[in-house]
């Protein structure tokens, strides 16, 4: 007989596209004698989402020593800085070196398929063959804006934590302008799996059952980003920050910078394209292929109602 089913689902994710689909279907057929049958299963799923994030690099622990200018310099603080709620001498503090604020847009497509065929010419013998396919594609774009600290912090306020003191406000005045960064990333991966199997189950007699299995699988993983790479990272920067500060006391840290393009820009007092310069562009690629071939032959011989003898042999080859 024939049987079929179809499922359709829509997912509402307000962080990406409002509605993304998921479709799956199953079909099976057997002949009138129930000696031969085929089944097919397939599914497709698409997801879109987004996220916002912040990051602080070099969570570096230092020891506070207000009497040692070198210790302050090690924290990126100038000797005559204004320090609010200063830690006690000998207390641990940490020094942030930058703040990055950004967002991601992510997309994923997943496809699965399975084909199975079975043939039973009689009650004692059954042949089964199957083929499976799976594909998962993920793409992501990211934009990050951020500030680097130059090691000339002239105002800092600490949070008063008695274990590890952390800055709440970190600010510095940079004469002549310094850079702040814009990082663009495009990332993509594609994973595929193909697997084929063949099986024979044979009741030779009431006492002897033989089983034969053969399987071959290959999985491949690689880049699906620009030019086939996993990651494209492109950085640009504007060297026109005259004063900058970060407020770590917010739910999401906030950063601000004033523009001074008098020495490293076009001196028009406006941050524009002429104040931006290219930085590092980096490609990252990673590819992997794994293959597994398997073979097994085993059987069971019933000597009596209480005694059985199992026998078999197997082989497996793995390559990566």
Question: Language-model features: where?
Answer:
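Outer-membrane beta-barrel translocator/receptor signature
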Residues: 1-80, 105-111, 124-125, 207-208
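A broad structural signal for short, well-ordered beta-strand segments within beta-sheet-rich domains
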Residues: 85-88, 162-178, 278
